[in-house]
Regions:
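C-terminal and late-domain segments of enzyme folds
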Residues: 154-205
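N-terminal beta1-alpha1 cap of cysteine-dependent amidohydrolase-like domains
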Residues: 1-77, 91, 105-107, 114, ...
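Pocket-forming structural segment of enzyme catalytic cores
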Residues: 90-169
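Gly/Ala-rich beta-loop-alpha elbow adjacent to hydrolase catalytic centers
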Residues: 79, 83
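A short secondary-structure junction motif
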Residues: 49-55, 85-95, 187-189
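Glycine-rich nucleotide phosphate-binding loop and flanking beta-alpha elements
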Residues: 11, 49-51, 84-86, 154-156, ...
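Active-site-proximal beta-strand elements of phosphoester/diester hydrolases
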Residues: 6, 148, 183-187
Length: 205
């Protein structure tokens, strides 16, 4: 069973619909301990302020169980957008600590690109990814993968061996990261049409 954590970030119903199109597994939106225990994959679809999301996570009665399942039992965990950002240690957007499951920091985009031109922030729209290493998350036959982004802050992973792909927007940022069973994507697969569908097909294969 695939579990999308409830009441933390937005877009959960859109994420569920896209996952249901991509695989034949049961998908639930819940924070119940029984569902967390039964899940094979846990998804955090985060949209919102870093501190607000961390407050909601820390207030969950099931938070310790989630940590146990992810860190000790190594159940698969996927963070989407801000759900990816809270996997790291800290963010320039807020003052609260992140989960710290992957070392790194979340930084705000500069207002100017490398040529001194004004950079529109937030980064909204379609963008491509630069593959750094092979991963089952990416389709080898689809070299021109493009995904839909909406964010003002970006992930800077400390250990680059966990970075699967980067994206260019004024500067390079980490757009897909994976450390063992824990993965994060900065883009929105649920808004990325055929590319998002294929991403979920690969992830759940």
């Amino acid at each position: 069973m695939i579990l999308i954590l409830e009441g933390i970030g937005g877009n959960v119903h859109s994420v569920r619909r896209m996952i249901q199109k991509s695989c034949n597994q049961t998908v639930k939106i819940s924070n119940k301990k029984s569902d967390i225990e039964a899940s094979k994959t846990i998804i955090l679809a985060g949209v919102g302020h870093f501190d607000s999301i961390m407050e909601k996570i820390n207030s969950l009665e099931s938070f310790q169980l989630i940590q146990k399942r992810v860190l000790n039992e190594e159940v698969n965990f996927l963070g989407i957008c801000a759900g990816m950002q809270v996997l790291l240690d800290r963010s320039e957007e807020g003052t609260k600590n992140g989960l710290g499951w992957i070392e790194g920091e979340v930084k705000k985009f500069n207002q100017l690109d490398s040529d001194g031109n004004i950079l529109k922030v937030p980064h909204i729209g379609w963008n491509s990814i630069n593959r750094l290493r092979d991963s089952k998350l990416l389709n080898k036959k689809m070299a021109d993968e493009r995904f839909y982004f909406v964010h003002s802050y970006y992930v800077d992973c400390l250990d680059k061996k966990y970075v699967i792909a980067t994206t260019d927007y004024g500067e390079k940022f980490d757009s897909i990261i994976c450390k063992k069973n824990i993965c994060g994507v900065q883009f929105h697969p649920e808004k990325s049409h055929i590319f998002g569908l294929k991403f979920f097909e690969n992830y759940f294969s």
